Amino acid sequence: MGCVCSKQLEGRRQEDISLLASQTFFSEAEVEVLHGLFIKLTSCLSNDNLLTKEKFQFILIKNTKKRSLSAERIFGLFDMRNDGAIDFGEFVHTLNIFHPNSSPRDKAIFAFRLYDTRETGFIEPEEVKEMIIDVLEESELMLSESIIDSIVSKTFEEADWKKDGIIDLEEWENFVATYPLTLKNMTIPFLKDIPRIFPTFLR
């Protein structure tokens, strides 16, 4: 009986892997490797095969106590069902956006949602400033408030061509098309060579 159940579970798992491969830029072999990586990541604090916000923040900044705006925003975008945990399917689908073959538009939309911390459908100056400060603090870097304000002002001067004090998705897409380096961190090169980078997860 146990053997039959085990085979059924393995068959279902293989179906899930095949489905994820068909929906993303990853091959079945690469999804297998990502599954091994996911299991390793989810076991950092407990073995429940889910990435909770606490685990996610621990992986990103090695600290579960300190609030991290960027970690919260990234977690929220991975957590597509908004149920407080990232499952393997959500993990793969979100990583797919960072794949080198993913479209610039998908990357731009993801980055836009990252900066739209209040989820209003547009980016406000205060949101950009908060994200800059958060990233600087996590990197243990310091910039004066006047320099940060100057960066924010310059960004809006370039991006907000409608001059209404906010950046909507259309303006954002125009901005990143003009300054493609803005999306540099939206591509993870090794996702195109997963089996070589993570050979220990091959089965």
UniProtKB/Swiss-Prot annotation:
Expressed in green tissues, but not in the roots. The record marks 139 as: Involved in dimerization. It comes from Arabidopsis thaliana. This is Calcineurin B-like protein 5. The lineage of its organism: Eukaryota, Viridiplantae, Streptophyta, Embryophyta, Tracheophyta. CDD domains: EFh. Residues 30-65, 66-101, 103-138, 147-182 form the EF-hand domain. Signal peptide: none annotated. Belongs to the calcineurin regulatory subunit family.
